[in-house]
């Protein structure tokens, strides 16, 4: 054998040996370390399964990072969606307590500042408890006693619910992988984009993995894995603009997370209200620019005291990478008229993008044996993640 042939043979053998060293064998492999992927990892690992998670970025960078951190059962449609949200809430609290990740059981207030908004809030408080919601109507005086962050002028009442709570997405996504690794032996492979998935196999540039069950939870990445399935589904994207204030004074707490009249038109839970039609007609006439950009305003507080304020909703596969300052101005104008906080100066602005489908709250594909693709398509992945993960794993035959 000449020297060149020997070198080529040696190089090939080294590569093959390296490839073998980088082979992974687990029970459950998960593509994506956003909250939906992490929920699958927690439930599978808690049940004693060997779990590996592959994330294309150094840290999760998608919708799970760029949101309010609200777990929001009050907004989910009555029936299956609301039941999933409540089950997800139970599992959320379990993992947060185990991991000692900071959260606040704040509840939520939908504050009404017009006769039409108050009518929807009151009607929902009358009908929803029979459908499994825990909520009640508050008079203006009761609402102000419950939240010192509301402007009193013009307040007509509010809808109170104790089921909502908040986490800081940045802290959560930073800490939860470490907890899963240390407590349950979950192995994380960051900077590891998955290039191909087959029955019981997946491949990255550096690793090959064999797993009895594979879950793909890639958010709005419709191009990398099984693009033909996404194409046929009619899935699209939603872009939302959000902001964070500077930190509030030490010790100042927002209390309940806040929503307002526009939110009654955004969340499907409120479709049970006959009075919603009159509110929609009123707001379309008086606030057309808010409808143009799909704006409704929510406010939550992070662990370091900052307030997260947003958001807008623009739809399409080709959502613009450029933000519109006029949208943020509208959000802040609306918030200032209803929100009484020490500091509303903005420290950060960004946009998030999530998968969207007008007909389905989530998409499930089984492109090949042992593989399940899951994408939440209504912007409620934080709320639904653990409930959906539990259902998905059970349907795949993973014992929990």
Tell what function each PLM region has.
Residues 46-65:
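Glycine-rich FAD pyrophosphate-binding loop
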Residues 294-296, 302-308, 314-400:
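C-terminal catalytic lobe of FAD-dependent flavoproteins
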